[in-house]
Design a protein with these regions (language model features):
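Catalytic DNA-binding helix-loop module of base-excision-repair DNA glycosylases/AP lyases
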Residues: 34, 106-152, 178
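C-terminal end-helix/capping segment
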Residues: 59, 142-170
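A short linear-motif detector with a strong N-terminal bias
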Residues: 43-44, 64, 117, 158-162
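Helix N-cap/coil-helix junction residues
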Residues: 77, 97, 119-120, 156
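N-terminal polyanion-binding entry modules of DNA glycosylases/AP lyases
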Residues: 1-105, 109, 167-195
């Protein structure tokens, strides 16, 4: 990581996040859910189609619950993701989840609260911690782009498993988010990171 950091003296760790649409925690959760198994570009296009259904804005939880699931499917959202979006919207609408409360939770509590939602796993919750809450010690070991960046940075002859990424990232504590940002940036701008 030292060479990657030294090679980028003017690096802005938030620049890659700034390339994403502006979003609060709820928006980041929608982005992460819609973006499961998709590229950032495909996620953006799908979100744009969703916004077109709601007069150009992301739907509130109440709007999402009132929406015809078929229209969301036509916008490119899979049935499984529609179920996840609806479960999240129900929990936010009935008070089982509250974005203000979630924002104040520790990372572990946040992860536990969100992964209780059907269809939200660690990658989705970790992404929201990183993108919306900008927590300092988050890594997304399940993210394929990050795994490829770690492979390149550490000159591995194989794509590291999620467990290998977690083990490698232990060295980055308590600034795993910063290291993740360097690696994502290198992956997105096409440079070859070195450790």
């Amino acid at each position: 990581m030292a060479r990657l950091i030294d090679a980028r003296p003017d690096f802005d760790p938030h620049a890659w996040i700034a390339q994403l649409p502006p979003m609060d925690l709820y928006g980041a959760l929608l982005f992460q859910i819609v973006g499961q198994q998709l590229s950032v570009a495909a996620t953006r296009r799908t979100l744009e189609r969703i916004q077109a259904l709601f007069a150009g804005h992301l739907p509130s939880p109440a709007e999402l619950l009132a929406a015809d699931p078929g229209s969301l499917r036509q916008a490119g959202v899979s049935w499984r993701k529609i179920g996840t979006l609806r479960d999240l919207a129900e929990r936010l609408s009935d008070g089982r989840l509250d974005v203000d409360v979630l924002s104040g939770l520790s990372d572990e509590e946040f992860m536990a609260a969100l992964t209780a939602v059907s269809g939200i796993g660690p990658w989705t919750a970790q992404g929201a911690l990183l993108i919306a809450l900008q927590r300092e010690d988050v890594v997304l070991p399940g993210d394929l782009a990050l795994r490829k960046a770690v492979q390149s940075a550490y000159q591995l002859d194989h794509l590291p498993s999620q467990q290998e990424v977690v083990a490698i990232a232990e060295k980055w504590r308590p600034y795993r988010s910063l290291a993740t940002s360097y690696l994502f940036s290198a992956a997105f701008d096409g440079t070859s990171p070195s450790p």
